[in-house]
């Protein structure tokens, strides 16, 4: 079927620049498809023709056919959309007045709350209600600032003046704080403008020979001259910075000059107090400690040799097994009451049939000074006894 005879293509002489698409159809840039072609696309679609076949028969691009059919299925219309236009205006004077009224009643009202209230009071319907972003734009442009009213030029100056005042106050506070040099020396710092002017003058008066802007000690001294520090304070600061770092103030060897007594007065008093405390701790007297507190007590040192002859309160004495050297009867009688223990050597019936080598497989245990007295041990190595005495 030849559609060119029934549906002539539009001319391009009066409507603008045109062209021929890949299918051989003629189109005009910026103009919609003619209504007769649109109607034919819908008719072929109702007949069950596929969009790709419609595109080839009518020589219209596949995207154009799909767009026309999609709009027809959604809205039932084959009319073209507005080209270069926008959505219908929702910010009508009535809506703007209502939004302004809501903001005057409640300045903290959110945009979504305004939108819900417009729908609740039937000022707008679902199609004409402005979006949240549109309401925010209306509030910024038309509610907070009335139309035809210029922005006051003094607002910028007010903001800048406030910021300058705040910065200057912060600078003044930091200069007068206790962590600065002025705060340590107890000097009242002048205004920030005076300090800035003096710094600028110092930079101009003291050029650096190598061309860099890093100041040296001479520049700092020249900068600090004037009302900031006196000559005596400058000398004190120079001595402090020339002093060797990490030096011990109690063992310094340099002689202290008369003008340096103020620097070391606090340090000397602290050192003197520490010396007195050391002396008091080294030689305590009953008068200093107090009569109610007992003095230091000394306890005898019990070595490994005499450990066998000592007992702890509440525990029975240590009695070595039979055949390994035992205590005499008077010794046991003096250590514990006779009614509790007998004078015969201690033996257990369970181990009566075993010899000593089975009960003590390690011969080193038999030579330990812990189990024997001085008489039963015999000639023991002096190094072992000495090592045990230390522990």
UniProtKB/Swiss-Prot annotation:
PTM info: O-glycosylated.
Start and end residues of each stretch annotated as RED subdomain: 94-142
Gene3D superfamilies, alphabetized: Winged helix-like DNA-binding domain superfamily/Winged helix DNA-binding domain (1.10.10.10)
Annotated GO MF terms: DNA-binding transcription activator activity, RNA polymerase II-specific; DNA-binding transcription factor activity, RNA polymerase II-specific; RNA polymerase II cis-regulatory region sequence-specific DNA binding
InterPro entries, sorted: Homeodomain-like_sf, PAIRED_DNA-bd_dom, Paired_dom, Pax2_C, PAX_fam, WH-like_DNA-bd_sf
Keyword set, alphabetical order: Chromosomal rearrangement, Developmental protein, Differentiation, Disease variant, DNA-binding, Glycoprotein, Neurogenesis, Nucleus, Paired box, Proto-oncogene, Spermatogenesis, Transcription, Transcription regulation
Site residues (Breakpoint for translocation to form PAX5-ZNF521), renumbered to this chain: 303-304
DNA-binding interval(s): 16-142
Physiological role: Transcription factor that plays an essential role in commitment of lymphoid progenitors to the B-lymphocyte lineage. Fulfills a dual role by repressing B-lineage inappropriate genes and simultaneously activating B-lineage-specific genes. In turn, regulates cell adhesion and migration, induces V(H)-to-D(H)J(H) recombination, facilitates pre-B-cell receptor signaling and promotes development to the mature B-cell stage. Repression of the cohesin-release factor WAPL causes global changes of the chromosomal architecture in pro-B cells to facilitate the generation of a diverse antibody repertoire.
Protein name stated in the entry: Paired box protein Pax-5
Organism: Homo sapiens
């Amino acid at each position: 079927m030849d559609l060119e005879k029934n549906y002539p293509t539009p001319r391009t002489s009066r409507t603008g620049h045109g062209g021929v698409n890949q299918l051989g159809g003629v189109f005009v840039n910026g103009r919609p498809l003619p209504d007769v072609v649109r109607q034919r696309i819908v008719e072929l679609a109702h007949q069950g023709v596929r969009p790709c076949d419609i595109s080839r028969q009518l020589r219209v691009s596949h995207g154009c056919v799909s767009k026309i059919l999609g709009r027809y299925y959604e809205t039932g219309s084959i009319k073209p959309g507005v080209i270069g236009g926008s959505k219908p205006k929702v910010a009508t004077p009535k809506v703007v007045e209502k939004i302004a009224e809501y903001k005057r009643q409640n300045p903290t009202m959110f945009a979504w709350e305004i939108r819900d209230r417009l729908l609740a009071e039937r000022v707008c319907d679902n199609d004409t209600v402005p979006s949240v972003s549109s309401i925010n734009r209306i509030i910024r442009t038309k509610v907070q600032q009335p139309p035809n009213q210029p922005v006051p030029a003094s607002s910028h100056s007010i903001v800048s003046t406030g910021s300058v005042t705040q910065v200057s106050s912060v600078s003044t506070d930091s200069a007068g704080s206790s962590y600065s040099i002025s705060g340590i020396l107890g000097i009242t710092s002048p205004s920030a403008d005076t300090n800035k002017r003096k710094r600028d003058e110092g930079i101009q008066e003291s050029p650096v020979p190598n061309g860099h802007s890093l100041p040296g000690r001479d520049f700092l001294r020249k900068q600090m001259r004037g009302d900031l520090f006196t000559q005596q304070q400058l000398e004190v600061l120079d001595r402090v910075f020339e002093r060797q770092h990490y030096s011990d103030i109690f063992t310094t060897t340099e002689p202290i000059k008369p003008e340096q007594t103020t620097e070391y007065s606090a340090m000397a008093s602290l050192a003197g107090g520490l010396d007195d405390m050391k002396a008091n701790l080294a030689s305590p007297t009953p008068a200093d400690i107090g009569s109610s507190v007992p003095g230091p007590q000394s306890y005898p040192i019990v070595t490994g040799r005499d450990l066998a002859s000592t007992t702890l309160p509440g525990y029975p004495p240590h009695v070595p097994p039979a055949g390994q050297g035992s205590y005499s009867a008077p010794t046991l009688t003096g250590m514990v009451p006779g009614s509790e223990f007998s004078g015969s050597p201690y033996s257990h019936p369970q181990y009566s049939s075993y010899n000593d080598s089975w009960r003590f497989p390690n011969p080193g245990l038999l030579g330990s000074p812990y189990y024997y007295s001085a008489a039963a041990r015999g000639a023991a190595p002096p190094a072992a006894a000495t090592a045990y005495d230390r522990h």
